[in-house]
UniProtKB/Swiss-Prot annotation:
One of its GO terms (biological process) is translation. Pfam families: Amidase. It comes from Dehalococcoides mccartyi (strain ATCC BAA-2100 / JCM 16839 / KCTC 5957 / BAV1). InterPro entries: Amidase, Amidase_CS, Amidase_dom, AS_sf, GatA. Keywords: ATP-binding, Ligase, Nucleotide-binding, Protein biosynthesis. This is Glutamyl-tRNA(Gln) amidotransferase subunit A.
Length: 486
């Protein structure tokens, strides 16, 4: 008997289409897996068994009538930063502990239209601020490969549930690496689309000029199938780009002969572990063997400034976006009967966690009179320089190849009291958000039993190219097929 929880989207779809399994069977298998593993992994904020089984039943009826799409009947999970009508959406914050949205995020509606089955909402760093999922106001998600390690963040629950085979796929959000870094730590495929490719409507905002929604899957083909479902223009999101959505799965034939790939030197900095560099070199050898040309002498000299730029711009946007949480309109309220200003002050003091408060303070400082030009405006100028450097590089190369992270999954609590060390986890991913580029992290091996991720960065809206390279690499390797022993 096929182990149903190990199936990819493509494999599940074929079995459903051939009537060899039902969505109800597939969904029950994943719910049983969740029940078994959640006490240890803690990937889910909310599990929705009744909703899932009802949606699975509807999917089975549609399949019997011959109405089946690539995601019909496929069990999935959503990061708890995406609004779900009638289902609690907390952002893993006390501030939204009991918030139930009256509407769905655009991507949630699109997945429902495709017939996907919602298993539940996943844990995350509070308001998507963090790199380990330790900043959740409720509990810390654990890495399925080693439960003493973090799964990455901020979308740690979404990465962990796919790695642990608790869901066939999941959605996360990526502001500075929050899909790709946990994908690397959990050895799954994690994709950040081009900025504007996927509607952010119904995504609780962290930094609006950087946020983007994307999938976690078991391989690049599955990633393409999910992107086919969620990409596209939405007039409710002013940053959504009105263009024809490509078929992300077309051209995934394993052939990248003649592709020109660049390797930026700045991504192999002093804080990069040598054993990770070794794994990336092995991966470059695979890509070269597939017929791609590799140039290891690419330079993007403004890369070292990206971290500083990010930690001025992202907190600045966050301080504005989070000003709406005042204890009056919705969400947590400390004591609405007190003086309004005092109640608002105490609501924010007790409703937000320490990392969120830290970033609000940084952002408020950067936007304040006397510092706006010195910090915020200057950061925007450097952002432009970083984007221009990428554009110049893409005049010569089809894609850029880097490590996803400079470090391996670290122990729970190891970096929690050192914000700078935590921020350094995203040095390889942040520049891509600053430039609005597409990028994917795929499994590239293991060091000491812990996963290493390879990052493939594409030109703006050349999302298909990144997918083609990722798929070709996975056709030639088997790292993505490895699963943790649980």
């Amino acid at each position: 008997m096929t182990d149903l929880v190990k199936l990819t989207i493509a494999q599940s779809h074929k079995l459903l289409k051939d009537h060899k399994i039902s969505s109800a069977e597939l969904t029950k298998a994943h719910l049983e897996r969740i029940e078994k593993l959640e006490p240890e992994i803690k990937a889910f904020m909310t599990v929705c068994p009744e909703t899932a089984l009802s949606q699975a039943e509807a999917a089975d009826k549609a399949i019997k009538q011959g109405d089946i799409r690539p995601l019909t009947g496929i069990p999935m999970a959503l990061k708890d930063v995406l609004c779900t009508k009638g289902i609690r959406t907390t952002c893993s914050s006390k501030m939204l502990e009991n918030f139930v949205p009256p509407y769905n995020a655009h991507v949630v509606d699109k997945l429902a239209k495709e017939g996907a089955v919602l298993l539940g909402k996943t844990n995350m760093d509070e308001f998507a601020m963090g790199s380990s999922t330790e900043n959740s106001a409720y509990f810390t998600t654990r890495n399925p490969w080693n439960t003493d390690k973090v799964p990455g963040g901020s979308s740690g629950g979404s990465a962990a549930c796919v790695a642990a085979s608790e869901a066939v796929f999941s959605l996360g959000s990526d502001t500075g690496g929050s899909i790709r870094q946990p994908a690397s730590f959990c050895s799954v495929t994690g994709y950040k689309p081009s900025y504007g490719m996927v509607s952010r409507y119904g995504l609780v905002a962290f930094a609006s000029s950087l946020d983007q929604i994307g999938p976690f899957t078991k391989d690049a083909m599955d990633c393409a199938l999910v992107m086919n479902a969620i990409a596209g223009f939405d007039d409710r999101d002013s940053t959504s780009v009105p263009q024809t959505v490509p078929d992300f799965s077309s051209g995934l034939d394993g052939n990248i002969k003649g592709f020109k790939l660049g390797v930026p030197k700045e991504y192999f900095s002093q804080n990069m572990r040598p054993d990770i560099t070794e794994k990336i070199n092995d991966a470059l050898g695979v890509l070269s063997g597939l017929g791609a040309s590799i140039d290891r002498e690419v330079s993007l000299p403004h890369t070292p400034y990206a971290l500083a730029v990010y930690y001025i711009l992202a907190p600045s946007e966050a301080s504005a976006n989070l000003s709406r949480y005042d204890g009056v309109k919705y969400g947590y309220s400390y004591n609405p009967t007190e003086n309004m200003w005092e109640a608002m002050e105490k609501t924010r003091a007790k409703g937000f966690g320490p990392e969120v408060k830290r970033r609000i303070m940084i952002g408020t400082y950067a936007l304040s009179a006397g510092y706006y030009d010195a910090w915020y405006v200057k950061a925007q100028k450097v952002r432009t320089l970083i984007s221009q450097e990428f554009n110049n590089a893409f005049e010569k190369y089809d894609a850029l190849i880097t490590p996803t992270t400079p470090n391996l999954p670290f122990s729970i609590g190891e970096k929690l009291n050192d914000p700078f060390e935590m921020y350094m986890c995203d040095t390889c991913t942040i520049p891509i958000n600053i430039a609005g580029l597409p990028a994917v992290s795929i499994p590239a091996g293991f060091v000491d039993g812990l996963p290493v991720g390879l990052q493939i960065i594409g030109k703006p809206f050349a999302d298909q190219t990144t997918m083609r390279i990722a798929h070709a690499f996975q056709c030639a390797t088997a790292w993505h097929k490895e699963t943790p022993r649980l």
